[in-house]
Amino acid sequence: MSGRFAEISKDGATGARRKRSHSCAAAIVGALLCIGSEPQIAQASVQFSPQLEGAIQRASERYSMPQSTLRAFAAIESGGNSRAKTGSYYGVYQLSHGEFRKYGGHGNIFDPKVNTDVAARKLRSESDAFSLQYGRAPTATELYMIHQQGVGGAAMHMANPDWPAWLNMYLTDEGRQKGPGWARLAIWGNVPADQRAQFPGGVDGITSRQFMDMWAKKMARFGGSARDAYAGAVVDGVQ
């Protein structure tokens, strides 16, 4: 099942979509994600096809992305199902056609080899952009927030973790264009059904900190425990 609400547009710059302790910067200028100590979480077991495993290994080597992160994204987005379709998102990594083209995709978006390669290139690009902005590589969860909520949404969540999550989404450029209803659905549509009971107030009762922490735990369940994405990617022979 995809972790992304089906109708969120993520093609624009602001488009929506473990055990290690670390301190979080207090200054808003840092706008760093503060999830706190990562708890030990029971691992979920997901079996991928040999074809997808091979694609993940090749993409990891080509783009210097941790295999653990790529596997976790695939598990959360589609369970490894290459035929998955959620609204306007397709394949193992639930890419839109716009994303697919932007990051060099050709041929069949449902092809797990192609879908994985494009997704890894996209995540590498987003990881590098994060590093330039914040002076460090992103955690797997931070990278997933960018993938799911968009660059603008992720930045707002990190800068204002104790604000209502939907309000942070509404204050992005895309949120202002599409309105509060869209922003609320961008959050509540990404709260799994089995997690909603802990938020009796509904979407109004979930802060960005709670939203990010919920996804950090899910990421950890699927093995996305690498502290940082790898640096120094080599793309098409150029570092």
Language model feature labels by segment:
Residues 105-115:
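A short, structured beta-strand-centered segment in the mid-to-C-terminal lobe
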Residues 192-239:
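Low-complexity, Gly/Ser/Thr/Pro-rich intrinsically disordered linker/tail segments
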Residues 65-68, 90, 138-140:
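Extracytoplasmic
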Residues 29-80, 113-134, 222, 227-233, ...:
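Export/targeting segments at the very N-terminus of extracytoplasmic proteins
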Residues 141-208:
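Catalytic and substrate-binding regions of cell-wall glycan-acting enzymes that process beta-1,4-linked
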Residues 78-85, 126-130, 149-160:
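Secretory-pathway/luminal and periplasmic proteins that interact with or process carbohydrate-rich
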Residues 2-58, 82, 98-106:
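N-terminal export signals and maturation junctions of secreted/periplasmic proteins
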Residues 88-105, 119, 123:
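Substrate-binding/active-site groove segments that recognize
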